[in-house]
From Swiss-Prot:
The keyword Hydrolase applies. InterPro entries: EgtC, EgtC-like, EgtC_Actinobacteria, Gamma-glu_amide_hydrolase, GATase_2_dom, Ntn_hydrolases_N. It holds the Pfam family GATase_4. Pathway: Amino-acid biosynthesis; ergothioneine biosynthesis. Its EC number is 3.5.1.118. It is an enzyme of class 3 (hydrolase). PANTHER family: GAMMA-GLUTAMYL-HERCYNYLCYSTEINE SULFOXIDE HYDROLASE, GLUTAMINE AMIDOTRANSFERASE DUG3-RELATED. This is Gamma-glutamyl-hercynylcysteine sulfoxide hydrolase. Catalyzes the hydrolysis of the gamma-glutamyl amide bond of hercynyl-gamma-L-glutamyl-L-cysteine sulfoxide to produce hercynylcysteine sulfoxide, a step in the biosynthesis pathway of ergothioneine. ERG is one of the major redox buffers which protects bacteria against redox stressors and antibiotics; loss of ERG or mycothiol (MSH, the other major redox buffer in this bacteria) leads to respiratory alterations and bioenergetic deficiencies that negatively impact virulence. It comes from the Bacteria. Gene3D superfamilies: Glutamine Phosphoribosylpyrophosphate, subunit 1, domain 1 (3.60.20.10).
């Protein structure tokens, strides 16, 4: 389980989304307000952002609230497309940097909020870790993000207890799914935020219904029920 956040819009500092908001990921790492499973997200954190078309990552297996080095550098990290997460490891899963989102295939950044039985996922060398989220990410990358809707529906059918909230970014798109956990959206004048839970009390936040696919581009936001989804158009 985790809390994750994505941004697509104007260039902004990473700190403005992750550290500065009153209920941002820094606070969500120890006091989330809407988390259904787990009480804290102290098993690591990761920030990914796009440097032009190149995805960059900074990940740690330590709690976000205590990372003074990241806190000092985050205001200088700026991008038009950002994906960040704080992690609460599923019981039995390793606590290590390679198990910490965001995961990448060199083009996309991806985070998974939830849990899935690894037995329903194909084993493969592409996964960054043996944890369920990393194997799920590798499965999604293998099928392609254009098939995200179909992939989530199939995995959900194979594991009825799975929670499959995905957030992915490629520099020009944000793609997300809701499957068993919360996701909120904020349309700002300078861009769009997708987040597991609101980072402040702005009245503009709205909740995404469960079992939906969300796509954010420069043209706008599209929501599709997952039983009708075939991935981003």
């Amino acid at each position: 389980m985790c809390r994750h956040l994505g941004w697509l819009g104007a260039q902004v500092a990473v700190s403005s989304l992750v550290l500065d908001p009153p209920q941002g990921l820094r606070v969500q790492s120890y006091a989330p307000r809407r988390q259904k499973h787990g009480l804290m997200n102290a098993d690591g954190w990761g920030v990914g952002f796009f440097d032009g078309a190149i995805p960059r990552r900074w990940r740690s297996a330590a709690p976000l609230w205590g990372d003074t080095s990241f806190h000092s550098v985050a205001p200088a990290l700026r991008s038009h497309c950002i994906l960040a997460a704080v992690r609460s490891a599923t019981v039995g899963m390793p606590i290590e940097v390679s198990a910490t989102p965001p995961f990448t295939d060199g083009h996309w950044l991806l985070a998974h909020n939830g849990v899935v039985d690894r037995a329903v996922l194909p084993a493969g060398p592409a996964a960054e870790s043996v944890c369920d989220s990393a194997i799920l990410a590798a499965t999604i990358f293998a099928h392609g993000l254009d098939a995200l809707g179909d992939t989530i529906v199939k995995v959900g059918a194979a594991d009825p207890n799975a929670r499959l909230n995905i957030l992915a970014a490629n520099g020009s798109r944000l793609i997300a799914t809701t499957w068993g956990d919360t996701l909120s959206i904020l349309r700002r004048a300078d861009g769009v935020v997708l987040a597991s839970e609101p980072y402040d009390d702005d009245s503009g936040w709205g909740d995404v219904p469960d079992r939906h696919l969300v796509e954010v581009t420069q043209k706008g936001v599209t929501l599709t029920a997952l039983d009708r989804a075939k991935g981003p158009r």
